[in-house]
Regions:
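Juxtamembrane inter-helical linkers in multi-pass membrane proteins
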Residues: 91, 258-270, 440-446, 696-700
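Membrane-interfacial, low-structure loops and terminal tails that flank and connect transmembrane helices
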Residues: 256-280, 436-438, 573-583
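Perimembrane loop-to-helix junctions flanking transmembrane segments
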Residues: 40-44, 310-324, 616-619
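Soluble extramembrane regions of membrane proteins in the secretory/endomembrane system
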Residues: 31-229
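Non-cytosolic membrane-interface motifs at loop->transmembrane helix junctions
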Residues: 402-410, 473-483, 541-552, 618-624
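Post-cleavage N-terminal segment of exported redox proteins
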Residues: 1-49
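Cytosolic-side membrane-insertion boundary helix
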Residues: 213-238, 269-279
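Hydrophobic cores of alpha-helical transmembrane segments in multi-pass integral membrane proteins
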Residues: 7-28, 60, 68, 205, ...
């Protein structure tokens, strides 16, 4: 297929996919669960106002939001899902009170009698009592009484009740002794929990399925998997098999266009780095340090799972609570991975064009300072927010937004977007001379610029929701950032960069690389753009979103099935000629990326991808398995590989200390594999069994998670964590050793 036809196909995929994505974004807005004006009882008593719910959402976000447990399944894993937890406790109290109304003790009743009260419970909680004319939700006096009791329970939990029961529970949840100081804020957060759980159990108008597609699984209240989950899960598997067959046929009948005669020496050996290319060295140094800090924060966060109020006896909750350590751990992962790729772009652009624009080094240095300011400022702001030193409005702008992966305050988001636009400007001005030549590189250059544009501007999706935007809408835009920005266009960018590198090394023909990259981008984006919806199955979205997410996210797995071919191709390149040995470890990172793409994104990703699977598994440790294996295993190791390619060009005259970088490489990969498979995966499997057998709330409960064997399995991640941590430390030592000498082993 010619590049021209591939461009038409790519344009069609992008336009159609974003058209559908936008249309159903409007559909989510149209059908989202209502924010009531107030919640009242049948006798007219006001339980809480609608504004209390919105303010309560901000209160929850200010204590860490999705880094302190989760709501609707999105968030952290140590504390419970508050919507599921509230629902379960509400159901228990209602059953008890319904039986007491008849002079009976529910717990001592036979199963047949309990079933009668469970029917009454479902009639009570599943009926949609929202009045569209008045905007009011109506509770029965009994349910209102339960809501008040639950408000008192959560007040004891978050305001620091010192009774042994709540001290123990806070430790199990890794909560601060006093997550909140203000009782009024606690009332508002309880109202938010009540509304979030109401959304999970209340039937959509005209249906017998809740706003969240009956998530979370809880048979007691009638939350069981609806028919649509089974149907679209089956359809997604059929789509996967069909498209895999088509892709296998395409590869089988395609001929590999290999380079006939390989260069006898390194084509890049004589290239002298320009001043702006040399200026990217400090980016790599800072990224390596951020990797270390992020690793330490990850270890602290993981330890909170076994010792919820301290670190080996040290009371660090007082100054580094779990909400902060986890926020920093996740945020730094995004920032260092993104920065490594941005630095690669700044290094590659002048190398591709052969031109150093005037003041390019100044621009690279200014951008470095700006990014450093955003990183430090956002982390400090998050600490002030979680420690309750900011008001709700100030917290939104400067502190902690409460949404995973976009925790940083809105001001820092805006400044980061400005930095990305500056990066785009620096990229384009360096590439313009190459574009003007209109040679055989133009197709890859055009795709390079398109990917750069997407990286700069798609981050703006994180600005599309406000401080009190409905969570269904905020989740929609949040996943634009996480799925499309991080997982989507950064991957396209990396594919183009890798193609340029291999072409410049003389290992690939530019024509075949162009066709391969365009085809890969079409395949990837065909499933990837609309695959965004698979994150939104249970985020109060309509069934059509579930159907699209299941179908198109299955297509994301299709190219991963044949990724072994890419790994083998990269391995062959690493052995193709003597001088390529200098690029062994960057290429090995690409091979490792292929492995983790298959295992982390492919196997572990598809394990939780079908709606019927995610219905039981959302927010369990199975999600953490996929997250670590895919985010660090794929994007992190790819970022490390790209940095090593840049370092090879920045220090062209020296052989590397293979023992040092090789040990780092293998320890990082083996450590990650052990951490994921020996500890996190077994916990996820045990949780999955509990969620399927009993209910979702039980799989997240302190009673289940604090069992002795669960504690033992959590401790079993130590060997993997240690290997990974030492490997990352050795990587940093190697990177700085290229500058200071200990990573050099003579001249080339």
């Amino acid at each position: 297929m010619t590049p021209k036809k591939l461009w038409y196909a790519l344009a069609a995929v992008i336009l159609l996919s974003f058209g559908v994505l936008g249309f159903f974004g409007l559909e989510i807005f149209r059908t989202m669960p209502p924010f009531p004006t107030k919640v009242v009882t049948t006798d007219g008593t006001t339980l809480f106002e609608g504004q209390d719910i919105k303010d309560g959402q901000n209160v929850w976000q200010s204590i860490g939001g999705q880094t302190v447990g989760s709501v609707w399944g999105h968030g952290a894993y140590i504390a419970p899902d508050w919507s599921a937890d509230y629902l379960h406790r509400e159901a228990e109290l209602l059953l008890k009170k319904l039986a007491e109304r008849d002079g009976l003790d529910y717990a001592s009743l036979p199963a047949a009698e309990q079933a009668k009260y469970q029917v009454l419970l479902r009639e009570e909680v599943r009926k949609n009592t929202f009045d569209e004319a008045t905007g009011v939700i109506t509770y029965s006096p009994l349910r209102a009484e339960v809501a008040r009791e639950l408000g008192a329970y959560y007040a004891k939990l978050f305001l620091g009740d010192t009774s042994p029961e709540f001290v123990k529970l806070r430790s199990a949840y890794a909560l601060r002794d006093k997550s909140l100081e203000d009782p009024r804020k606690m009332e508002q957060m309880s109202a938010f929990f009540a509304w979030a759980s109401w959304v999970c159990v209340t039937n959509r108008p005209g249906t017998d399925v809740s706003y969240t597609n009956n998530w979370p699984h809880d048979p007691t209240i009638g939350n069981i998997a609806p028919t649509s989950l089974h149907l679209w899960s089956g359809f997604s598997v059929l789509m996967l098999l069909t498209c895999v067959g088509i892709l296998v046929y395409y590869y089988a009948q395609s001929k590999e266009d290999e380079v006939g005669v390989l260069p006898t020496s390194d084509p890049l050996r004589g290239m002298k780095p320009t001043p702006s290319m040399r200026a990217t060295t400090k980016y790599i140094w800072i990224v390596s340090l951020l990797i270390l800090v992020q690793m330490v924060l990850g270890a602290i966060t993981a330890h909170y799972g076994v010792e919820g109020d301290a670190l080996f006896g040290l009371p660090i909750q007082d100054f580094l609570p779990q909400a902060v350590s986890r926020s920093w751990h996740v945020q730094l992962a995004i920032l260092w991975i993104a920065t490594s790729w941005l630095a690669t772009g700044l290094y590659i652009a002048p190398a591709v064009s052969g031109v150093e624009p005037k003041f390019q080094r100044l621009g690279v240095n200014v951008l470095f300072g700006a990014l450093l300011f955003v990183v430090v400022g956002s982390l400090v702001g998050q600490w002030f927010g979680v420690m309750q030193k900011l008001g709700l409005i100030e917290n939104f702008w400067l502190g902690h937004q409460g949404y995973e992966y976009v925790e940083l305050g809105r001001l820092w988001q805006i400044l980061l977007l400005v930095g990305l636009v500056l990066w785009l400007f620096l990229m384009i001005r360096a590439l313009i001379p190459a574009l003007k030549r209109k040679d055989e590189n133009r197709h890859l250059l055009t795709l390079f610029i398109i990917a750069s544009l997407a990286i700069a501007f798609f981050y703006a999706a994180g600005l599309m929701y406000g401080r009190q935007t409905h969570m269904a809408i905020a989740e929609y835009w949040r996943w634009w950032v996480v799925h499309l920005w991080v997982e989507g266009f950064f991957e396209v960018f990396a594919t183009v960069v890798a193609a340029f590198l291999f072409c410049r090394l003389g290992l690939l023909r530019i024509q075949s690389a162009t066709v391969s990259v365009l085809f890969s981008t079409i395949i990837f984006l065909s499933g990837g753009i609309l695959g965004t919806f698979h994150h939104l199955y249970f985020s109060a979205t309509p069934t059509a979103v579930l159907a699209l997410g299941a179908t198109f996210s299955a297509l994301e797995i299709v190219p991963l099935v044949l990724i072994g071919m890419e790994a083998y191709h990269n391995y062959k390149l690493s052995k193709s000629t003597d001088w390529i040995e200098a690029y062994k470890w960057p290429i090995y990172c690409f091979i490792a990326m292929c492995f983790w793409n298959f295992l982390g994104a492919g196997i572990f990703g598809f394990a939780i991808n079908p709606p019927i699977a995610l219905y039981y598994l959302q927010g369990l440790n199975t999600t953490a398995v996929h997250g670590h294996a895919a985010l660090f295993g794929v994007y992190g190791i790819l970022g490390i590989g790209l940095m090593l390619f840049c370092l090879r060009g920045l220090y062209p005259d020296y052989k590397w200390n293979d023992k040092l970088i090789g040990t780092a490489f293998w320890m990082i990969n083996i450590g990650l594999f052990l951490m994921v498979t020996v500890s996190v995966l077994p916990i996820g499997i045990l949780q999955a069994h509990e969620s399927i057998t009993n209910a979702y709330w039980s799989a997240r409960s302190a009673e289940f998670m604090q069992q002795d064997h669960m504690q033992l399995i959590r401790w079993m991640r130590m060997p993997g964590d240690l290997l990974l941590g030492i490997g990352e430390l050795l990587l940093v030592v190697f990177i700085f050793g290229l500058q200071f000498g200990w990573s050099r082993k003579g001249t080339r």
